[in-house]
Amino acid sequence: MKIILNQDVKILGEEGDVKEVAAGYFRNYLYPRNLAVPHNRFTVARFKQRQQDIEMRKSLKRQDAANLKARLEAQPVVIAMPAGTNGKLYGAVTSHTVAEQLACMGFEVERKRVEVPGLTLKCVGNYHVTIRLYEEICAVVPVTIKNQSEADSVSE
Protein backbone atom coordinates (compact mmCIF):
# COMPACT_ATOMS: atom_id res chain seq x y z
CA MET A 1 0.00 0.00 0.00
CA LYS A 2 1.34 3.44 -0.92
CA ILE A 3 1.35 6.07 1.81
CA ILE A 4 2.59 9.62 2.44
CA LEU A 5 4.24 10.29 5.81
CA ASN A 6 2.81 13.13 7.92
CA GLN A 7 5.78 13.09 10.30
CA ASP A 8 9.30 11.71 10.49
CA VAL A 9 9.14 7.99 11.32
CA LYS A 10 12.32 6.22 12.39
CA ILE A 11 13.49 3.60 9.91
CA LEU A 12 10.63 4.39 7.49
CA GLY A 13 11.33 7.95 6.34
CA GLU A 14 10.69 11.65 6.75
CA GLU A 15 7.69 13.92 6.45
CA GLY A 16 6.38 14.06 2.89
CA ASP A 17 8.07 10.84 1.72
CA VAL A 18 6.02 8.40 -0.36
CA LYS A 19 6.55 4.83 0.85
CA GLU A 20 5.22 1.35 0.19
CA VAL A 21 4.16 -0.46 3.39
CA ALA A 22 2.00 -3.41 4.38
CA ALA A 23 -1.70 -2.58 4.69
CA GLY A 24 -1.83 -3.88 8.27
CA TYR A 25 1.12 -1.73 9.35
CA PHE A 26 -0.61 1.34 7.94
CA ARG A 27 -4.04 0.45 9.31
CA ASN A 28 -2.92 -0.59 12.81
CA TYR A 29 0.07 1.63 13.52
CA LEU A 30 0.66 4.57 11.16
CA TYR A 31 -2.90 5.80 10.52
CA PRO A 32 -4.21 5.72 14.14
CA ARG A 33 -1.17 7.73 15.28
CA ASN A 34 -1.60 10.21 12.38
CA LEU A 35 1.90 9.38 11.14
CA ALA A 36 0.77 8.73 7.55
CA VAL A 37 -2.13 9.09 5.12
CA PRO A 38 -3.06 6.93 2.13
CA HIS A 39 -1.54 7.94 -1.20
CA ASN A 40 -4.31 9.29 -3.44
CA ARG A 41 -4.85 12.37 -5.58
CA PHE A 42 -6.26 14.46 -2.69
CA THR A 43 -3.39 13.78 -0.28
CA VAL A 44 -0.83 14.24 -3.07
CA ALA A 45 -2.31 17.67 -3.87
CA ARG A 46 -2.24 18.64 -0.19
CA PHE A 47 1.40 17.60 0.18
CA LYS A 48 2.42 19.46 -2.99
CA GLN A 49 1.19 22.64 -1.29
CA ARG A 50 3.17 21.84 1.88
CA GLN A 51 6.32 20.70 0.04
CA GLN A 52 8.09 24.06 0.30
CA ASP A 53 7.54 24.21 4.09
CA ILE A 54 8.76 20.62 4.46
CA GLU A 55 11.92 21.33 2.45
CA MET A 56 12.60 24.46 4.51
CA ARG A 57 12.34 22.46 7.77
CA LYS A 58 14.65 19.78 6.36
CA SER A 59 17.24 22.36 5.32
CA LEU A 60 17.13 23.88 8.82
CA LYS A 61 17.69 20.43 10.33
CA ARG A 62 20.63 19.85 7.97
CA GLN A 63 22.11 23.22 8.91
CA ASP A 64 21.71 22.56 12.65
CA ALA A 65 23.29 19.12 12.24
CA ALA A 66 26.26 20.59 10.35
CA ASN A 67 26.79 23.20 13.09
CA LEU A 68 26.56 20.53 15.79
CA LYS A 69 29.01 18.34 13.86
CA ALA A 70 31.58 21.15 13.76
CA ARG A 71 31.19 21.81 17.50
CA LEU A 72 31.38 18.11 18.41
CA GLU A 73 34.47 17.39 16.32
CA ALA A 74 36.30 20.44 17.72
CA GLN A 75 35.98 19.36 21.34
CA PRO A 76 37.50 16.03 22.49
CA VAL A 77 35.67 13.91 25.06
CA VAL A 78 37.71 12.80 28.08
CA ILE A 79 36.33 10.00 30.25
CA ALA A 80 37.99 8.94 33.51
CA MET A 81 37.33 5.32 34.49
CA PRO A 82 38.91 3.05 37.11
CA ALA A 83 41.49 0.78 35.48
CA GLY A 84 44.14 -1.74 36.42
CA THR A 85 47.89 -1.29 36.03
CA ASN A 86 47.80 -2.91 32.58
CA GLY A 87 45.32 -0.29 31.28
CA LYS A 88 42.29 -2.58 31.24
CA LEU A 89 39.15 -0.89 32.56
CA TYR A 90 37.21 -2.38 35.47
CA GLY A 91 34.03 -1.40 33.69
CA ALA A 92 33.37 -0.53 30.06
CA VAL A 93 32.70 2.64 28.11
CA THR A 94 29.48 2.28 26.11
CA SER A 95 27.35 4.57 23.98
CA HIS A 96 25.43 5.47 27.15
CA THR A 97 28.64 6.60 28.89
CA VAL A 98 29.68 8.74 25.92
CA ALA A 99 26.18 10.29 25.66
CA GLU A 100 26.24 11.15 29.39
CA GLN A 101 29.66 12.77 29.06
CA LEU A 102 28.46 14.78 26.04
CA ALA A 103 25.42 15.90 28.07
CA CYS A 104 27.79 17.12 30.82
CA MET A 105 29.63 19.09 28.14
CA GLY A 106 26.36 20.70 27.00
CA PHE A 107 25.55 18.60 23.91
CA GLU A 108 22.12 16.99 23.59
CA VAL A 109 22.76 13.67 21.82
CA GLU A 110 20.56 10.59 22.03
CA ARG A 111 22.29 7.41 23.15
CA LYS A 112 20.96 5.57 20.09
CA ARG A 113 22.85 7.90 17.77
CA VAL A 114 26.25 7.16 19.35
CA GLU A 115 28.19 4.34 17.67
CA VAL A 116 31.09 3.01 19.74
CA PRO A 117 33.54 0.78 17.82
CA GLY A 118 33.09 -2.80 19.01
CA LEU A 119 30.04 -1.71 21.09
CA THR A 120 32.23 -1.22 24.20
CA LEU A 121 35.66 0.19 24.95
CA LYS A 122 37.52 -1.75 27.63
CA CYS A 123 41.03 -0.27 27.62
CA VAL A 124 42.60 3.09 28.38
CA GLY A 125 43.49 4.99 25.21
CA ASN A 126 42.34 7.21 22.35
CA TYR A 127 39.36 6.22 20.20
CA HIS A 128 37.05 7.71 17.58
CA VAL A 129 33.29 7.49 18.16
CA THR A 130 30.76 8.14 15.39
CA ILE A 131 27.58 10.12 16.11
CA ARG A 132 24.80 9.99 13.52
CA LEU A 133 23.18 13.44 13.55
CA TYR A 134 20.79 13.75 10.60
CA GLU A 135 20.47 11.91 7.29
CA GLU A 136 24.06 11.29 6.13
CA ILE A 137 25.67 13.80 8.49
CA CYS A 138 27.90 12.02 11.00
CA ALA A 139 30.38 13.48 13.47
CA VAL A 140 33.54 11.56 14.34
CA VAL A 141 34.40 12.56 17.91
CA PRO A 142 37.79 11.86 19.51
CA VAL A 143 37.33 10.07 22.86
CA THR A 144 40.16 9.71 25.36
CA ILE A 145 39.76 7.21 28.16
CA LYS A 146 42.04 7.83 31.13
CA ASN A 147 42.73 5.90 34.30
CA GLN A 148 40.71 7.54 37.07
CA SER A 149 43.56 7.40 39.60
CA GLU A 150 45.90 9.18 37.14
CA ALA A 151 43.24 11.79 36.36
CA ASP A 152 42.71 12.43 40.10
CA SER A 153 46.44 12.89 40.73
CA VAL A 154 46.72 15.35 37.83
CA SER A 155 43.79 17.45 39.12
CA GLU A 156 45.31 17.74 42.64
Swiss-Prot record:
It holds the Pfam family Ribosomal_L9_C. Keywords: Ribonucleoprotein, Ribosomal protein, RNA-binding, rRNA-binding. One of its GO terms (cellular component) is ribonucleoprotein complex. InterPro entries: Ribosomal_bL9, Ribosomal_bL9/RNase_H1_N, Ribosomal_bL9_bac/chp, Ribosomal_bL9_C, Ribosomal_bL9_C_sf, Ribosomal_bL9_N, Ribosomal_bL9_N_sf. Signal peptide: none annotated. GO terms for molecular function: rRNA binding; structural constituent of ribosome. One of its GO terms (biological process) is translation. The keyword RNA-binding applies. Belongs to the bacterial ribosomal protein bL9 family. Binds to the 23S rRNA. This is Large ribosomal subunit protein bL9. The gene is rplI.
